[in-house]
Amino acid sequence: MHRKKLEEIRRLWSRRRALQGIGALGLGASACKDDGGNGDGTTSGDGSSGDASTGGSSSGAGSSSGGSEAGSSGGDSSGDTGPVASDCEAPSDLGADALLAPVEHIVVLMMENRSFDHMFGSLALAEGRAIEGLSGREVNPDAMGNDVGVHALQDTVVEFDPPHGWDASHAQWNQGANDGFVTEYTADGAPVPDEVMGYLTRALAPVSYTLADNYALCERWFASVMGPTWPNRFYLHLATSGGMKTNDPISSLGLPSIFDRLDDAGVSNRYYSSNLPFVLVYGKTEGIGQIADFFDDAAAGTLPQFSIVDPVLTANGTIGNDDHPPADIAMGQAFIASIYQALAASPLWERTLLVITYDEHGGFFDHVPPPTTTDAMAEFEQLGFRVPAIVIGGMVKRGCAITTQFDHVSVAATATRKWSLEPLTDRVGATNDLSSCIDPAFLDAPQPPVALPMTVVRRPRIFDEAQRERGQIELARACAQLGHDDAAQRRAAAAAIDAVLTWGQRLGVVRVVDDD
């Protein structure tokens, strides 16, 4: 679909939604294009988006689409309702500094291994929201050359972990054809080859869809690296992987992290771990809390100015709440709901930005060819596939699809601009910050949190020896070598799951049922 046509559809959809008053029923958000932002790619007739260039730190005129009325999800829910809708097409002459000035806290939650089309593609295909999602015409060839199309998944569990390492990801990309997902999955021994072409629906991920309806959905947030977890998480924390393409420690390189820069500037910060403290593999040993501490700090209004929160990572027989196959998406929804509601109920809500994103695509199909960016290492100029990303808060645009190009370095770019930090790398200055997600109209009038649907989960089986070689096995081994042994990992995982479910129930967004 050409960009001009997509813009026309978005405008028409927004008008229709306004006439029908759907937003008042809490049934989602529409999208109307604003031409003002950086990183807009062009689209072709088959629904694939073309290359897009990255710019410097984004200004307040960053591009967005949407403009429908934000609403609550209704039913069994918690939180305030009735927030004012954003005018996603409204121009602004405010720059990034002015937009970020009222922000006092930034919380970053990074989940695992899902692509944008896999998570949110059905917003376009099944619900008609005018975002860069699925059209239903997307296909990949199988090993015999037969077309395998996109289709709705029927279960919240994908048992077999699709390949997503450096080589596999580049084969899936195939110089922008994005046609290697099924063949790579098959070559890896997948029992159901078409699973990587499957997409989730609102019924399977109601929390994520409610947040996407009512806050800033970033439809062009790319993984920083076309490769696996560690390099992408390094870019979130360090704005570089030091040239690392694999899941291996880089502590010997002595690279500074965003936490170091914040410490230097006197900005309070903390890393909240669930079971596997990722920061250990690049040498950070201080300023580490547990997920239970996050809930306590949010409730008390004592969160640091900047924090990164990790879920229970699936590894070493632990089935986490991180969305990494074979983890159950329902547990991930409970985790996201609990983190969101902890902030929604916190006295810090009005001046906090919550960023929810995923480390990389996890081998799941996405139709948009990733663009390039600026990097000191030529092989790392190529971005990875799109990942789900939502920016949330009282000052954030409501129901808007943000078309500015982001990647994980956008977090460091935002913190660097907000607190006048020394940039970690040159890439920080060449990457858009998140100011285009903020609504100038809400700077002096932060909006109340939107209610979430109740997430009902069965009490999980946290450990499964049959899954010992699944998930973050390299991280589990690295943490064991650094003194966080297998027993400690399992104790931490059990405590973290318990904390999330306990707080989720206390906050009114999770209900746990026991098996008969």
Region spans (language model):
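N-terminal secretory signal peptides
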Residues: 1-14, 21-27
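N-terminal pro-sequences and low-complexity stem/linker regions of secreted or lumenal proteins
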Residues: 82-516
